[in-house]
Amino acid sequence: MKVLQEKILNEGKVLSGDVLKVDAFLNHQIDPVLMQEIGKEFAKRFKEENITKIVTIESSGIAPAVMAALELGVKVIFARKRKSLTLQDNMYVANVYSFTKQETNEISLSRNHIDENDRVLIIDDFLANGQAALGLMSLVEQAGASIAGIGIVIEKAFQDGGKKLREQGVRVESLAEIASLDNGTVAFVQHETAEVK
C-alpha cells in the first residue's frame, strides 16, 4: 500500500535493526485519513470472505480494525490485556509475549460477543514474531469460530511471524512488508508485479 509506505518513510523512525517507531500516525497519535484508507484496503482484500466479526488486540489494533469493520459493516471485538471490573467471568484467555515490551500478557475476550457462527478477520498493527496473532487465533478457536484471515498494517518480514502463520495455512495480508531496518533505513519487500500489455 503505497500511501502507507510513504507515511512510514516520512514519519516513521528506525530505533534499531528490529524496532520501527510509528507513533506519529499509528500507535500513539492516529492519522484518521490514513486509517480510513487502511480500512478500505482490508475490506477490499477480504470482501469475499463473508466476515461477521473483526478481532484485534488493545490498543494499537483498534483504529485499523474499526475502520475495516465500518467498511465491511461488521462489529469489532478487541482482546483485553488487563483485567476489567466489568469483565470478570466467562472469558476466553490466551498468553501473548510482546516483543516490543518484552513481557507476557494474558489476553481475553468475552464469550458473550463471539461464537461458532462467526467468521473472523483478525487485524493488528504489527506482525513481528507472530505471538499476538497466534494468541488472537487461540481465542477465536476457543470460541469455535472460523478464521478468514489476518490483516496486518506493518509486517516485519525479516522476523519469522508471517512465515509461521502462513505455514499453518493462514491467509495473511500485510499492507506494508518491511524487508530490513538495517543502518537506520526502512527497506520494503519488493513484490514482482505482472507486466501489463
From Swiss-Prot:
E.C. number: 2.4.2.22
GO molecular function, one term: xanthine phosphoribosyltransferase activity
Binding site for xanthine: L20, N27, K156
Origin: domain of life: Bacteria
CDD domains: PRTases_typeI
GO CC terms in record: cytoplasm
Catalyzed reaction equations: XMP + diphosphate = xanthine + 5-phospho-alpha-D-ribose 1-diphosphate
Subcellular location: Cytoplasm
Record-listed 5-phospho-alpha-D-ribose 1-diphosphate binding positions: A128, N129, G130, Q131, A132
Alphabetical keyword list: Cytoplasm, Glycosyltransferase, Purine salvage, Transferase
Pfam families: Pribosyltran (PF00156)
UniProt record, GO biological process: purine ribonucleoside salvage; xanthine metabolic process; XMP salvage
Function field: Converts the preformed base xanthine, a product of nucleic acid breakdown, to xanthosine 5'-monophosphate (XMP), so it can be reused for RNA or DNA synthesis.
Quaternary state and interactors: Homodimer.
Recorded family membership: Belongs to the purine/pyrimidine phosphoribosyltransferase family. Xpt subfamily.
HAMAP family (alphabetical): XPRTase (MF_01184)
Name of the featured protein: Xanthine phosphoribosyltransferase
Organism annotation: Bacillus cereus (strain G9842)
Organism ancestry: Bacteria, Bacillati, Bacillota, Bacilli, Bacillales
